[in-house]
């Protein structure tokens, strides 16, 4: 077959020179770079999943339930229990990971001539998804401590009048939390909708923005995922919680039968076993405290985190430091922020290997 490159294709001009998103996938012993839950699913969950797939396999010649009604019922029950906010399936929408959730929201509320504003550094897919939907992305820098500078944030929202504002809490890659009071201040000055990205909410003791949904029915959407605390990254299931009108909106842009029968069934099984799965959250939180304390003891600067990862520095060359960890068999994440790296909290043995490497690397003055 004739070899060609992207430059030979009639690609959209704004995509030329861009790079595909993705964390490095390398064959190393210790992988702490993608914020997965390191604990495998329980034997009971696996057995339930196998039995469920066996049951539905004879129906795979048929399209799946178009609107994932049963799954949304289960998600609503989970959110009601986990946050204390009573919701029904009419408040829930599910898709293939929170990235598809965010993409659908941008398709419905962004687009040509519209803008989305976010506080950087934050989740790197926000500007990528904005570009893919022809939504102009406005980046507002966080403060030196990586927290949202509220005076700057409110001033920029008033000046730029964005159609969409992203607030990620706990924030990725820094791990800090934006208080509900500050979320409300943002909602009250934002002219359009505010998407609160709570991908890591289960790791945080802070209250969920879902508690504000009744107060701001036309402006607030809370996005979540089952990829992190739920130990379900391979299942690719994201969802949002909002007023039912928002579900009506994304139904205008969603693809038909977007969630496969297997995805729906697997997610329902995972929700049935949520008590077991989320039982690992406390273990990871304890490990996060231990890892952060040891890093500080070694002389690193650590950003306070309420998630399943730790953001730390200061390096003069963070990529050289990343390579030094990799040379020691530990894969962590260089997210492109000067002087800093991010490590996912793994099982104790993985964290020990990371900390042993960190103890050696601090001496290199990288």
Swiss-Prot record:
Pathway: Amino-acid biosynthesis; L-histidine biosynthesis; L-histidine from 5-phospho-alpha-D-ribose 1-diphosphate: step 7/9. InterPro entries: Aminotransferase_I/II_large (IPR004839), HisP_aminotrans (IPR005861), PyrdxlP-dep_Trfase (IPR015424), PyrdxlP-dep_Trfase_major (IPR015421), PyrdxlP-dep_Trfase_small (IPR015422). One of its GO terms (biological process) is L-histidine biosynthetic process. The modification N6-(pyridoxal phosphate)lysine is found at residue 228. Its EC number is 2.6.1.9. The keyword Transferase applies. It holds the Pfam family Aminotran_1_2. Its cofactor is pyridoxal 5'-phosphate. Belongs to the class-II pyridoxal-phosphate-dependent aminotransferase family. Histidinol-phosphate aminotransferase subfamily. It catalyses: L-histidinol phosphate + 2-oxoglutarate = 3-(imidazol-4-yl)-2-oxopropyl phosphate + L-glutamate. GO terms for molecular function: histidinol-phosphate transaminase activity; pyridoxal phosphate binding. It comes from Corynebacterium glutamicum (strain ATCC 13032 / DSM 20300 / JCM 1318 / BCRC 11384 / CCUG 27702 / LMG 3730 / NBRC 12168 / NCIMB 10025 / NRRL B-2784 / 534). This is Histidinol-phosphate aminotransferase. The keyword Amino-acid biosynthesis applies. Keywords: Amino-acid biosynthesis, Aminotransferase, Histidine biosynthesis, Pyridoxal phosphate, Transferase. Signal peptide: none annotated. Homodimer.
């Amino acid at each position: 077959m004739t070899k060609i490159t992207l430059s030979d294709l009639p690609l959209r001009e704004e995509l030329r020179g861009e790079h595909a998103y993705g964390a490095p996938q390398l064959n190393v012993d210790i992988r702490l770079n993608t914020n997965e839950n390191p604990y495998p699913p329980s034997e009971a969950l696996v057995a339930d999943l196998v039995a469920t797939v066996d049951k539905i396999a004879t129906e795979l010649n048929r399209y799946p339930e178009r609107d994932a009604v049963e799954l949304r019922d289960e998600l609503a029950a989970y959110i009601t229990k986990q946050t204390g906010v009573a919701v029904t399936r009419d408040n829930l929408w599910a898709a293939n990971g929170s990235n598809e959730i965010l993409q659908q929201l941008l398709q419905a509320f962004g687009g040509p001539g519209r803008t989305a504003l976010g506080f950087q550094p934050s989740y790197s897919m926000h500007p990528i998804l904005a570009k893919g939907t022809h939504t102009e992305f406005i980046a507002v820098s966080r403060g030196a401590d990586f927290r949202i500078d509220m005076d700057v944030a409110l001033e920029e929202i008033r000046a730029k009048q964005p159609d969409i504002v992203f607030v990620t809490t706990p924030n990725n890659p820094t791990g800090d939390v934006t208080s509900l009071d500050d979320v409300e201040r943002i909602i009250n000055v934002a002219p359009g909708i505010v998407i609160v990205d709570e991908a890591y909410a289960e790791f945080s003791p802070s209250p969920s923005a879902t508690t504000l949904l009744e107060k701001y029915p036309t402006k607030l959407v809370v996005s979540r995922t089952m990829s992190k605390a739920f130990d379900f990254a391979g299942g690719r299931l994201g969802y949002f919680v909002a007023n039912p009108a928002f579900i009506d909106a994304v139904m205008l842009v969603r693809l038909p039968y977007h969630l496969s029968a297997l995805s729906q069934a697997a997610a329902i099984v995972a929700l049935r076993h949520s008590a077991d799965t989320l039982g690992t959250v406390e273990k990871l939180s304890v490990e996060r405290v231990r890892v952060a304390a040891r890093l500080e003891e070694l002389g690193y600067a650590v950003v306070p985190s309420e998630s399943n990862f730790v953001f730390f520095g200061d390096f003069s060359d963070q990529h050289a430091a990343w390579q030094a960890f990799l040379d020691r068999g530990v894969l962590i994440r260089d997210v492109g922020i000067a002087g800093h790296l991010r490590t996912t909290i793994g099982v104790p043995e993985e964290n020990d290997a990371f900390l042993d490497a960190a103890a050696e690397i601090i001496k290199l003055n990288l």
